Amino acid sequence: MLIDSHCHLEYKGLIEDRDGVLARARTAGVGGFLSISTRQREWGQVIATAERESDVWASVGIHPHEADAHADLGEAALLAATEHPRVVAIGETGLDYYYDHSDRETQKALFRKHIAVARATGLPLIVHTREAEDDTAAILAEEMEQGAYPALIHCFTASAQFAGKVLDLGLTISISGIVTFKNAKELQSIATTIPENRLLVETDAPFLAPVPHRGRVCEPAFVADTARFLAGLRGVSAEALAESTTRNFRLLFSKARL
């Protein structure tokens, strides 16, 4: 069994046929889905889906692109949302300097609020970082000194140096379908070095469909393609990688129950 540790089931491309999307994924061997929110208005939607589907769980958080629109969001709102039994994670949150859709200082402040809630609740923090390695690593380290919290880097595309820094902090790394891309040689190399007990797989659906589905809307079913490719890189069987990543998910997201 595989678990898609990061997908957006409420996004265009999936929501129109969500029942079919989930059915196809289950047929492909996917037994769990973490449905990620990126705006406060999505929280109710992801929670409602998780209430209906026993193998779907929800996250609550604000994507860095949306930081300016949520600059006044307090920790209390996040804390209240985490009380729902189907909410198992905080995020996605973090820093994105590639698009700079939100002020960088606002992104940083909101990122720290999410970390505080992850620390207070013990729920894993789902971190997005793009073109912001130094600041992301610095904030993660500074906040870890204030008290430990569980966290993962989702859709990892950063450097080997950054991977080393976050692994030293105790974080988990999640690999998406990007690893299957022909030009992803550096990521493929890094993916072979991640410790077995710190590795997850994801789709980030409806984005980033892996080979052989490039150009299509990505679905959670495609996590099986990413897992097979990743297993080949790491020199293990697809079954062994599915077993280890599912075990890692259950340990990290301990509130998620099947």
Please give the residue ranges for each predicted region:
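Mid-domain alpha/beta scaffold segments of enzyme catalytic cores
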Residues: 1-258
